[in-house]
Amino acid sequence: MKMNINKACDLKSISVFPPNLRRSAEPQASQQLRSQQSQQSFSQGPSSSQRGCGGFSQMTQSSIDELLINDQRFSSQERDLSLKKVSSCLPPINHKREDSQLVASRSSSGLSRRWSSASIGESKSQISEELEQRFGMMETSLSRFGMMLDSIQSDIMQANRGTKEVFLETERIQQKLTLQDTSLQQLRKEQADSKASLDGGVKFILEEFSKDPNQEKLQKILQMLTTIPEQVETALQKIQREICHTFTREIQVLASLRTPEPRVRVPTAPQVKAKENLPEQRGQAAKVLTSLKMPEPRVQVPAAPQAKENFPEQRGPVAKSNSFCNTTLKTKQPQFPRNPNDASARAVKPYLSPKIQVGCWKTVKPEKSNFKKRATRKPVKSESTRTQFEQCSVVIDSDEEDIDGGFSCLINENTRGTNFEWDAEKETERILRTARRTKRKFGNPIIIN
C-alpha cells in the first residue's frame, strides 16, 4: 500500500529563524546540524510509518532528545556570551598574574565600584533580547514539533486505514477458504458414500451369484461349449471321409461305364416301335445307369457291315479321344422347336415313320464264320437306295445347351449320306438333358475348411 505523507512537514516551507548578528559562528553551525537532522527525520518518516507505530514512537523520542540537547547547548553558549560581555565592560588588567590571584582579586574587590548604571541598563537590555530570542526559538521548535506530530498523526491514520483494508481482505480470504474447506469435506463424504455403495453392490452381486442354483447348469453349459469345437472337427473329418468314399465310388462306376463292350451287329426286326427300346433290352451298362439315375450319354445305332472297321472301340484310346474332341459336325442338324411348357417335347413320341426299321440290342455272340457268310449273302446296294446308318458319339463336357440353334455335341461321321430322323433326334435331346442335369448335380465342388 502507498502512503501519502503530508508535505507541510517539509522544512523548506518553514520560516527560518530571525537573524542574530551578535550570534557567533558556532550556534549557526549547530542550527544547520539541527535542521539537517530534522530533514533526515522527516525523510525517514514515511518509511518508518510504513513499518509501524513502533518506528513513529522511536522517531519522536529521538527528535525530543535532540531538541533538549540543543536547548542545553544554546543556554550554555548564551551564558558564556553574557560573561564575556560583562568582562568586556570591565577595565582591562595589565598585570599578569596567575588565575588564583585574579580570582582572589576579583572576589576581594567590590562589585559596586565596577558596576555602573549604564552597564546595568545595557546588560538588562541584552538579557531581555536574549530571552526574546530564546522564546522565539522555543516557539519555532514547538511549532515544528506540532507539525511533526500532525504529520505523524496523518501517517498513523493512513496506516490504520491500510491495516483495516488488509484485515477486511484477510477476512474475505478466510471466508473463501472456509467455503472451500466445506466443499472439500462434502466431496470427501460423497466419495466415501459412493465407495461404500459400490462395495455393497459388488458384495450383493457376488452373494447372489454364489447363491444362484443354476450355477451348476452354467458350468455344464460351459463344458459343453468347450467340447463343441472338438465335436465339430470330428464330424467334419467323418464328412470328408464319406465324401471321399462316395467320390471314389462314383469315379469307379463312371470309369467302368466308359469302358467299351464287345458289340456285334444283329439282324434288325421289322417295324419295331420306340416303346420296345427299354433299358432292360440295352445291356448291363444301361441297367447300371438307370439305377444311378445317370443315363448313358452315348447314342449308338447299328451300322452297316462295311463300316465295321471305323468303330471307335476298335481304334484304341487315342482314336476315342480324337473322335470325342477334335471332330465337329460337318452337316447342319435340323433345328427343333423347344417349348419348356410343352410336355410332348420332353417325351419321346411312340410312333415312327413307316420307312425306317429300328432294331433292338441283344446279347448274342455269333461266330466269325457266320458273320462273314451273312455279310457275303447281302447284296451291295447303290448309294441312293441303301439303308442309312451311322456310328456317332456324343460329348457332354460343355454346359451350354444352345450353340447355333442346336446342341453342343460333337459327332464323328464314318459313312456317307448320314441322316437323322425325327424321333432319334428327340431321344438324343432327352438323353443329353438328363446327363447334363446329373453332371451339374454331382459336379459342383464341395469346399470344406
Swiss-Prot record:
GO terms for cellular component: nucleus. Its main location: nucleus. It is found in: Nucleus. Residues 21-56 are annotated as: Disordered. Keywords: Meiosis, Nucleus. Disruption phenotype: Drastic decrease in chiasma formation at metaphase I associated with an absence of synapsis in prophase, due to the inability to make double-strand breaks (DSB). One of its GO terms (biological process) is embryo sac development. Involved in DNA cleavage that forms the double-strand breaks (DSB) that initiate meiotic recombination. Interacts with PRD1; this interaction facilitates a binding to DFO. This is Putative recombination initiation defects 3. It comes from Arabidopsis thaliana (Mouse-ear cress). The lineage of its organism: Eukaryota, Viridiplantae, Streptophyta, Embryophyta, Tracheophyta. The gene is PRD3.
